[in-house]
Amino acid sequence: MMPRLLLRDWPRCPSLVLGAPSRPLSAVSGPAEYLQHSIVPTMHYQDSLPRLPIPKLEDTMKRYLSAQKPLLNDSQFRKTEVLCKDFENGIGKELHAHLLAQDKQNKHTSYISGPWFDMYLTARDSVVLNFNPFMAFNPDPKSEYNDQLTRATNLTVSAVRFLKTLRAGLLEPEVFHLNPARSDTDAFKRLIRFVPSSLSWYGAYLVNAYPLDMSQYFRLFNSTRIPKPSRDELFTDTKARHLLVLRKGHFYVFDVLDQDGNIVNPSEIQAHLKYILSDSSPVPEFPLAYLTSENRDVWAELRQKLIHGGNEETLRKVDSAVFCLCLDDFPMKDLVHLSHTMLHGDGTNRWFDKSFNLIVAKDGTAAVHFEHAWGDGVAVLRFFNEVFRDSTQTPAIAPQSQPAATDSSVSVQKLSFKLSSALKAGVTAAKEKFDATMKTLTIDAIQFQRGGKEFLKKKKLSPDAVAQLAFQMAFLRQYGQTVATYESCSTAAFKHGRTETIRPASIFTKRCSEAFVREPSKHSVGELQHMMAECSKYHGQLTKEAAMGQGFDRHLFALRYLAAARGVTLPELYQDPAYQRINHNILSTSTLSSPAVSLGGFAPVVPDGFGIAYAVHDDWIGCNVSSYSGRNAREFLHCVQKCLEDMFDALEGKAIKT
């Protein structure tokens, strides 16, 4: 079970003004050091956030069985039903009581936080493809600002401005406003700032506003996942002031904050990046970055060799850098090329362990590629939106800006690593493994132009439910099956919430899919519309339950984790092939929509699966799908297109074309 990008469509920032005729340049001194000056302190609500509830065991069992129903035949389901009953009345009851007691003793956090960190950090698979996703920025609306040097400078300065704003407590708290006319106002903010932080959440709740957990934000900067035997560690050094830049597999560092914590003049940052872009050194014979794509135990062993070989100080500079800026030397050909580049690249020019890599291609196409153990995308999406808005609306430099007359050869340090023959062999082996894996990955995308959110809402259907129904229908059309499907939902409304799983495959989607795919002529348009409405209603219920911490996946995961921690024999429920099957997520799905995002993507979570990143926009639906050689992503997308056409036909009162 590997959660992907933050799914629920929380509003992140005011709508972007994309066609502003002129732009003020930020001076980056004094007030311009910050993106915003929130009158409510950033962490004002954190202490009073509600705690993530532990569902009742009987509710978890009911929800689990409901999710299993479309995946099992009658005899399999009866067997699973018996195992659930035995678990609920036996060892499960005992484990649940222990979980409740443990949760009572740890009121500073959530019951899932520790186990979830462990799940990520003990995983030994490469972080590339298995965990790290990407989000690509829309181009700067002013085309001349998409020059690589200009955009890299502006994104870097805006990112450092975000860092300063966050650490000064001046970043607006993350709040989900159900009634923004009441809660997203200066008057309310002036009032709530005086409410003690131990009570502030309740004040927001009274005006239908829901503050979200921001505990993950501190890992956004100066952070790296360090490979260790058996379990990795998250490392953060907030004192470091330098940026790490990768280009052609070479490593460079320079300060982006001065000794007083002020942002270095943007024209100096521009000069340093120009200096790096002018370095004509060829790609190193043994590009060290490949090691971050290795199996974690292999990388841990090689890292120790690096340290013992006299590279400790150099590695420390990589690990502690505010973030990693990757400058690529080629433009993007199309969306598929963009996805491959931002999801994995060629392995030489990313440090996959950094909390995030900010990638800027030759044509200014930019993306954030992030490591997933430290957070679920809540912080990344907020950072992403704020940086896009700031860099496009108040850019630090213009295309005609001249770089500072500074000696970058003094300010920029090019890092060099001493590599033993064992390390060189390690890099070569990592490269071979990386190249072989990437050859098996296919990515393809479609844009369905007939309609989107506006049309579906007029038909009183959940846009997300319709997209998920299209995936169920498409898989049935292509492979004749209903399979385990995963949609991640943020539980950031709770203290140290992570994610919960929505299980989109249901008896309703199965019935509706079979009607559309196998027997459309047997059903009237009205019947098909009714089935879609049933799917939408049930999906809405599942989504609400998940967001409120009332799914079944995290609860069962925590009980299993507790059993292992207490040395209890693995309960039979977890040995059931049905449990293995529902957690073998052939359809792993993730959605986000934001004015800043052009598209996102991730790899399948199982070898025979699809990784489906999608967004339902106002008048179109986008879908970016990955697969390994055992599945056909292009054919799947043809099926998705056909299924969306069929559903839109039915909603418009037309007969389904066979």
From Swiss-Prot:
Residues bound to (R)-carnitine: 486, 488, 499
Sequence ranges marked intramembrane in UniProt: 179-208
GO BP terms: carnitine metabolic process; carnitine shuttle; fatty acid beta-oxidation; in utero embryonic development; long-chain fatty acid metabolic process; positive regulation of cold-induced thermogenesis
Enzyme class of the recorded protein, top EC level: transferase
Catalytic activity: (R)-carnitine + hexadecanoyl-CoA = O-hexadecanoyl-(R)-carnitine + CoA; octanoyl-CoA + (R)-carnitine = O-octanoyl-(R)-carnitine + CoA; decanoyl-CoA + (R)-carnitine = O-decanoyl-(R)-carnitine + CoA; dodecanoyl-CoA + (R)-carnitine = O-dodecanoyl-R-carnitine + CoA
Gene3D superfamilies named in the record: 1.20.1280.180, Chloramphenicol acetyltransferase-like domain (3.30.559.10), Choline/Carnitine o-acyltransferase (1.10.275.20), Choline/Carnitine o-acyltransferase, domain 2 (3.30.559.70)
Recorded GO CC terms: mitochondrial inner membrane; mitochondrial matrix; mitochondrion; nucleolus; nucleoplasm
Pathway the protein contributes to: Lipid metabolism; fatty acid beta-oxidation
Major site of localization recorded for this protein: mitochondrion
Topology, Mitochondrial matrix side: 26-178, 209-658
Active-site residue list: 372
Residues with the N6-succinyllysine modification: 69, 85, 239, 418, 424, 439, 510, 544
Residue list for modification N6-acetyllysine: 79, 239, 305, 418, 510, 544
Binding site for CoA: 452-464
Keywords carried by this UniProt record: Acetylation, Acyltransferase, Fatty acid metabolism, Lipid metabolism, Membrane, Mitochondrion, Mitochondrion inner membrane, Transferase, Transit peptide, Transport
Subcellular location: Mitochondrion inner membrane
Pfam families referenced in this protein's UniProt entry, alphabetically: Carn_acyltransf
PROSITE patterns for this protein: ACYLTRANSF_C_1, ACYLTRANSF_C_2
Keyword Acetylation set for record: yes
Membrane topology, record value: Peripheral membrane protein
Primary role: Involved in the intramitochondrial synthesis of acylcarnitines from accumulated acyl-CoA metabolites. Reconverts acylcarnitines back into the respective acyl-CoA esters that can then undergo beta-oxidation, an essential step for the mitochondrial uptake of long-chain fatty acids and their subsequent beta-oxidation in the mitochondrion. Active with medium (C8-C12) and long-chain (C14-C18) acyl-CoA esters.
Protein name, per record: Carnitine O-palmitoyltransferase 2, mitochondrial
Organism: Mus musculus (Mouse)
